[in-house]
Regions:
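Gly/Ala-rich beta-loop-alpha elbow adjacent to hydrolase catalytic centers
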Residues: 107, 111, 115
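Catalytic active-site module of serine/aspartate enzymes centered on a nucleophile-bearing elbow/loop
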Residues: 251-285
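Flexible "cap/lid" loop of the alpha/beta hydrolase fold
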Residues: 116, 120, 127-161
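Conserved alpha/beta-hydrolase catalytic His-Asp/Glu region
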Residues: 162-220
Length: 285
């Protein structure tokens, strides 16, 4: 099974407007939708992103965790549009398959921007947002202090140029964590195996063109409760982006997690789940 794949009893799939959509479903109760993070493409699944929090969050909720196109098992999909648009359509397709009309959406990294895009495109489907480790826009937003491209962005480009280089994969994964010990031999081996099993996702991702699109001016249109959870040591999306998003959305609260990189639900799962549960309970959603 490995670190990237959920136990078979939790694995689900459906067909969306762009093709196959894979997701994880577990728990009973009010729905909660989670969207996977950005990372190695392919090789970053919803299970890898949220395995550390799903058992707890699923104790009182029906949790749906969706793979992003070409990163997990969703796809393969070749596109020429803002990358978060087909991702949002995949999330909506998973919600439709589960009979979920509306729900709070939790996303980190690319999954968070996908949640923002879904909330802007179909506000009736999103009752609350937990985001972070993200830009508001496809293609990124301006940085005031941090260098661009980011360390993780450079490492991702190096891996894309040499997709079979295990050393490049290991270096990329290390940039996603505060603690380099998180990049175990098991994680590298499982990610490598997943990438070899899904060459069509690798080809589709390489052939796709993500068109930049700014959501900055639209953020004030989001009126549902919002929480931003950002790792203080994020080397992909600097912490200042969490400050920026929370400043554009008046009702958004911001939580900084120290000793945490780009994947808060992976590196700080207890604290991440604490914040999500408190947010949902406080807002009655």
């Amino acid at each position: 099974m490995g670190l990237l794949d959920a136990p078979p009893q939790f694995a689900r799939s459906t067909t969306g407007p762009d093709g196959p959509v894979h997701y994880v479903a577990l728990g009973e109760g009010p729905p909660l939708v989670l969207v996977a993070a950005w990372g190695p493409q392919p090789g970053t699944t919803a299970w890898l992103t949220y395995a550390g929090v799903l058992e707890r969050l699923g104790a009182g909720r029906r949790c749906i965790a969706v793979d992003l196109p070409n990163f997990g098992r969703t796809g393969p999909l070749t596109f020429h549009e803002p990358a978060h648009d087909p991702a949002a359509r995949a999330v909506a397709a998973a919600m439709d398959a589960e009979g979920i009309a509306a729900a709070p959406v939790v996303g980190t990294s690319m999954g968070a921007t996908t949640g923002i895009v879904l909330a802007l495109a179909a506000p009736e489907r999103v009752t609350g947002l937990v985001v972070g480790a993200c830009h508001a826009s496809t293609g990124g937003d301006p940085y005031l202090l941090a260098p661009f491209p980011s360390e993780s962005g450079v490492a991702a480009a190096d891996l894309a140029a040499a997709p079979d280089d295990e050393g490049a994969l290991r270096r990329f994964l290390r940039t996603l964590f505060h603690d380099p010990a998180r990049v175990t031999d098991e994680l590298v081996a499982d990610t490598t195996a997943f990438r070899k099993q899904h060459p069509e996702h690798l080809r589709a991702g390489a052939a796709s063109v993500s068109v930049a699109h700014s959501n900055m001016a639209l953020l004030s249109e989001i009126t549902v409760p919002m929480l931003v959870i950002h790792g203080r040591s994020d080397r992909m999306v600097p912490f200042e982006q969490g400050l920026m998003i929370s400043s554009y959305v008046p009702q958004a609260d911001l939580v900084a997690l120290n000793r945490c990189g780009h994947w808060p639900p992976v590196e700080r799962p207890v604290e991440f789940a604490d914040q999500v549960e408190l947010f949902l309970r406080r807002n009655g959603i």
